[in-house]
Amino acid sequence: MSSSRSNNRATCSRSSSARSKHSARVVAQTPMDAQLHAEFEGSQRHFDYSSSVGAANRSGATTSNVSAYLQNMQRGRFVQPFGCLLAVHPETFALLAYSENAAEMLDLTPHAVPTIDQREALAVGTDVRTLFRSHSFVALQKAATFGDVNLLNPILVHARTSGKPFYAIMHRIDVGLVIDLEPVNPVDLPVTATGAIKSYKLAARAIARLQSLPSGNLSLLCDVLVREVSELTGYDRVMAYKFHEDEHGEVIAECKRSDLEPYLGLHYPATDIPQASRFLFMKNKVRMICDCSATPVKIIQDDSLTQPISICGSTLRAPHGCHAQYMASMGSVASLVMSVTINEDEDDDGDTGSDQQPKGRKLWGLMVCHHTSPRFVPFPLRYACEFLLQVFGIQINKEVELAAQAKERHILRTQTLLCDMLLRDAPVGIFTQSPNVMDLVKCDGAALYYQNQLWVLGSTPSEAEIKNIVAWLQEYHDGSTGLSTDSLVEAGYPGAAALGDVVCGMAAIKISSKDFIFWFRSHTAKEIKWGGAKHEPIDADDNGRKMHPRSSFKAFLEVVKWRSVPWEDVEMDAIHSLQLILRGSLQDEDANKNNNAKSIVTAPSDDMKKIQGLLELRTVTNEMVRLIETATAPILAVDITGSINGWNNKAAELTGLPVMEAIGKPLVDLVIDDSVEVVKQILNSALQGIEEQNLQIKLKTFNHQENNGPVILMVNACCSRDLSEKVVGVCFVAQDMTGQNIIMDKYTRIQGDYVAIVKNPSELIPPIFMINDLGSCLEWNEAMQKITGIKREDAVDKLLIGEVFTHHEYGCRVKDHGTLTKLSILMNTVISGQDPEKLLFGFFNTDGKYIESLMTATKRTDAEGKITGALCFLHVASPELQHALQVQKMSEQAAMNSFKELTYIRQELRNPLNGMQFTRNLLEPSDLTEEQRKLLASNVLCQEQLKKILHDTDLESIEQCYTEMSTVDFNLEEALNTVLMQAMPQSKEKQISIDRDWPAEVSCMHLCGDNLRLQQVLADFLACMLQFTQPAEGPIVLQVIPRMENIGSGMQIAHLEFRLVHPAPGVPEALIQEMFRHSPGASREGLGLYISQKLVKTMSGTVQYLRESESSSFIVLVEFPVAQLSTKRCKASTSKF
């Protein structure tokens, strides 16, 4: 499917790279940003913002303009005057660059009139260490050797001459180290990187508030966040600003001073926040402007440097002229902007291990704070806000995932209903019935152009206009299967202007060479609701000429005047799926018209494919059961009544209760009293489809374990479901916490004898580490060394977060920033004296193996009760359990894949079957000969047999012999002839004749029972015999021996013996064994025989396989009640077929 977008980016399915699409948007927007920047620099006071945005969208900048623009954005030559900047060589600390105000701020400016030979106090090449007191330059030198210097920020330093304190905030650039120096307010208690706990305490209440909010309410989450940030920082206005799919922005939450105009609901064009600025927000999460009207300070640098130094990561970076003017126009003097990043969308490539790969980040939005007077926020408070935003990012990740899942579920439900309609009336039914195609994706109208007729829903173009669109698609997009665009104008459709704003966006799919389905969307502005006052021409922003939120809004409306809301990837996937179903349905319909019998011949192979899929699923399931039974972790399961139906060997070993004694007992009877409510909660949640995690239950002990006290388990509950997704029970995957609780009790009793625990060589001791109140490792026990691959000497004295567990290529790497944020919350919560929840924590060890664990942390105190750090335990599943869980995931995935495949096959086969039935209905009233009527009757029976097989989704009921059997009146000979017809293609191909041999009464015998199942089993046995018979060996004989029995005066039972005889040696013995004893490794043929044998048994019959010297035979013994005996003359049948 081709696509057309206003910014030339492709609309593709989720299997395409989301990262590539974002790159395309960046490439498209950057020249527009550069064009606007060039126009602003060239026009200054006469710059007309609204019209320039529209012009930039229509024309691009030259390559040289783009390069100059990016250079200016990333390598500006000015800083804000509230601090000073130093750039140094990373090894020698020789000065490479400095801001002009550095000498004055560091009190290096000479007070006397300088002489000619007096040396400058600060110059390129100066050893920066000489500018600070000894303890300060030692701290700077140590930080320079650290892998990630950002983790050590801020470093408290003191000027050598005056002793004035500064926060030194360091980051690396291509030529060395940049040091931002911010003066410390004497009334504030100075902190360093080790004072991160203080920063955490500042935001602790806000973090707890965010984490306590219910999921599924993004608006509430954003409202709470802006209020918390407002209380923390004191800014006059705080806004949550979200980037949409097409890169434009929207204010979705706001907390402001009552006298300020609201900006809630205001939309901004993508160019309002240039892509270069967004890149800077990804690099430097916090951007502070203390006074936009302050004169910026120039940076002086070494002439030998080939280009200006990069100040992307510097908080001191001065605002550009256009941004300063924008702030001034809206009455804002100071600002604080913090980025909100989330995990990038993962490509749906089917890689089962993708969830264990490190994830990239993308910019979701910004937290924007404005103040009407100059305002400075010290680093500790900025760090607290940044940490709060990281927590918010984790919450947003959850909300984005939940929203995507909800949307997919809605689309899948709608697709299912649409497929059902298609079976009755394709493709018109999806327009004439409810739900319809407009329920599949959000749109304002839809149209079906099919066989030169038109069906429409909602707001659509006229019939003539739709025909013009069809002609345009056939002429200019004939090579594609469809087109999607958010702007027909920019897609090049010549009649777009005539459509007005009613139809701007369109998704079209081709369901045949001349037939189309359309979805239409109106212009974006219709969706926009702004909470602010409406714009009046007499307002102070000069009718949109100045840069102001109002002019941004006006520019945005101008940009989207001919554009609709973009088509999301998940929506295009749904549309594309419907297209495939429709195309397949229409092709099958055409094929059935040309060849009515073709589908019947291929049906058995589809059936075997279904059975093969279930066989593979059964094999995986059996392997999973074996692993669970032998796992070294306790695993148990209950049915929906709460009775035990699974109890593995480890559970039996820990409790002393054997498997056979546990099965059938209520779980609540096996737990101690204080765990009864927990078990009931888990079961109630499971019945609602909610899976509880990390809950503690205590099991009673029995027999030889009775004196050891209860077994303490940390359990995760997994809902067990059948193929229809109905919850049928709960499986508990547990960790034995008894040993850890013993250790924790001992730890509590000894009150600080930590070393005795950590260095204990007992295998009961789990992986343990300790940190001090600064976040550095103090202890790292042997179990931690084994699981992480990091030796004790390499962990001790290292920062736990940043050096040991990291997002970089050294230490133990975690999947994403969110994991480190959660770990930081856990450590800070403990050290601040609170009781934290256990943390599900995953990381890659030094061998690259992904480890999943449950982390428990508790505070460490000294003799006076002062908190000195944290003691942490890791609970890791055994390799056997990890493998079992992996197999379980594979099993669930295989089950879902098989279910989807089977559903698709069953769905697709119904269409040709319906076509065949329709053809049959046309033929029945015709004047047919007796022979033709018999052929038609056999054809009907084949179709009905195939339909019966397609409804077999519960093989377990067949195996247990309680599948439902039909009861109909049928003619036995017609059923037998149908069996022979099914074998004819294979018989003719192998040139093996099939003889039939049955007495005269069979032809006129009408019985009562399930004729279709009888046909199925006899046809399966016959096909198996044909497979293992060679042409030269002789014919196959289908023999029927009936015996009638009178039951009372009015009822007869027909005892039937079917003998299917073929020449020796016959069917291999291994296959016959598979027929009677199902095994996980059974072949397709063996599984077919096994199912047929079970069906015969369900009919109260038996199957035998007899080997003789000359021949071998399947012998099927069944009985049916006689419905009636025909009075017409019966003839014996002994002919060849």
UniProtKB/Swiss-Prot annotation:
Biased composition regions of type Low complexity, renumbered to the chain: 1-18
GO biological process, one term: red, far-red light phototransduction
Protein's UniProt keywords contain Repeat: yes
Transcription regulation recorded as keyword: yes
Domain GAF: start-end pairs: 217-400
Residues reported to bind phytochromobilin: 322
Protein name: Phytochrome C
